[in-house]
Amino acid sequence: MPQNVEPLENLIDQFGRFPGVGRKGATRMAYEVMAMSNEQAMALAKAIEHAKTDLHRCRVCQDYTAGEVCGICASPKRDRSIICVVESPRDIQSIERTHEYNGLYHVLHGLISPMDGVGAEQLCVKELLARLNETVKEVIMATSPTVEGEATAMYLAKLIKPLGIKTTRLAYGLPVGSSLEYADETTLYRAMQGRGEL
């Protein structure tokens, strides 16, 4: 590669780090950035910088927030007897779009995956267990219906059941091997309504 395209190659490499983005997609995004005005490109860079410096994990549910506690955890209108456990903050947005769930959430920030060297100790499991008190009556396992999602849900259910708290799993409507993030509102609604006890 000629020396003068090194910054472009670096940009392509950085975009290529995103999950699901291959070389072609990364190249397309890099050229889109190059086609932006300087003001637009700087606004994008600043938005990334602000998100990384101003957002952190909610001390209760582990979702991203600018404050100490996120809006959902702080809301007195939420049902505090139900906690929905999700893999990532993106999954909260997917479930919230259904307008059918009014409980609280807990973000694990990953799934148990021995093949990838990810164990329960690398997830926000101890934070979840610390939240389980006499107020909580049900924990919904809303992890993706993949091998890792199922393993994580079963692991958590084994930890929670002895506490006398009902543990349920999202049911039909979610195809096996898919990601919760890509499910539409109707599919998620049916899965929430048809959840089963673990």
Each language-model region and where it sits:
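Cys/His-rich Zn2+-binding cysteine-cluster or related metal-binding knuckle/ribbon modules and their
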Residues: 2-8, 17, 27-92
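Extended interfacial segments that mediate partner engagement and assembly in macromolecular machines
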Residues: 26, 75-143
